[in-house]
Amino acid sequence: MSSRPKSPSDDEHDMRSAIAVMTADYCYLTMSHKRSPRHQATPSRTCLFCGATGPLNGEHIYGDWLRNLGFTGEGVREIVPGDGSQPIIQRGGPFSKKLKIVCYPCNNQWMSGMETAAQPMLTAMFNARGSSVELDQAAQLTLARWAFKTAAVAAQVDRSDPFPLPHRREFRQTDQPPHHVQIRIGAASIPMLQRGEQLAESRFEPRTATITYAGQSISFPFYRASFRLLTVVFDILGYVAETDLVDIDPGEDLKRALLPLWPPEHPRIWWPPVTSLDVIGGVPGLTASPIVGVPMLVPGGQG
């Protein structure tokens, strides 16, 4: 992982505020998602990823190593349930929130390793200050694994358990993001809201996708998980099926604002992309953007 010289197109991505501004003692995190009736709550004392039963450990939604970057003051967390109920407001350190949802081996060995591996890359992006950070395929996989883990944990914040169980199990078994998942990375500014600087935000939306061809249709569970940590944005699209159904296309506009991490498409990529997600309204605008897919399986026939 290295940096290349700043180019004129990098001017719009000046990241100096990433360190200079975000060291305020008062910060604001938002987590929101829609609940899906398809997913029942995981039984208590069952590990989110491996399914082991027994005592569970608390897992930070965002790693506590972030406090070493200066984010240690008073904070506010807002949890917005997708069922229309009132937002839940919590006070506490910006990156101190834990969820007791994983077993000891998953938390202290497997997930801890992911956090440790991703930390230098994330820190380099936080400190980019207008330069571009090079990510080879090994770095892309490291960030994709970390992003999928983080999105799955964040989705459990109100205990509605919306994240598809098959994808959690596949992730644990293969140690890679699931086959029917696409992960992209982008950049956005840190909003200043009424409660303070919004250091992080995450959204999870379960949906139903439908492929229609020659008058026939196939519907299947689909989801989008998007989150921003400081100035780095991850967008995760996935569907649950036993065969390849669709190739998700972000569209030409988003291709300039999102770089592919998983599955890898390029030996090297440079973050940030040429276009900031600020132009579409950050994470809220991203989750509202349409999703286009090319069918890979013809209903009633062969793919």
Locate each region found by the language model:
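Serine residues within intrinsically disordered or low-complexity segments
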Residues: 2-3, 7-9, 17
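C-terminal, charged low-complexity interaction regions
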Residues: 6-10, 164-303
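An N-terminal structural lobe/cap that precedes and organizes the functional/catalytic core
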Residues: 11-113
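Generic structural signal of hydrophobic/aromatic residues within well-ordered alpha-helices
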Residues: 19, 76, 106, 114, ...
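Catalytic cores of phosphodiester-bond-cleaving enzymes
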Residues: 32-40, 90-159
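Intrinsically disordered, low-complexity boundary segments flanking structured domains
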Residues: 44, 48, 134, 220-221
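Short C-terminal domain-edge/linker segments immediately following a structured domain
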Residues: 79-80, 132-137, 266-268
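Low-complexity, polar-biased intrinsically disordered regions enriched in Pro/Ser/Thr/Gly
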Residues: 80-89, 130, 200-212
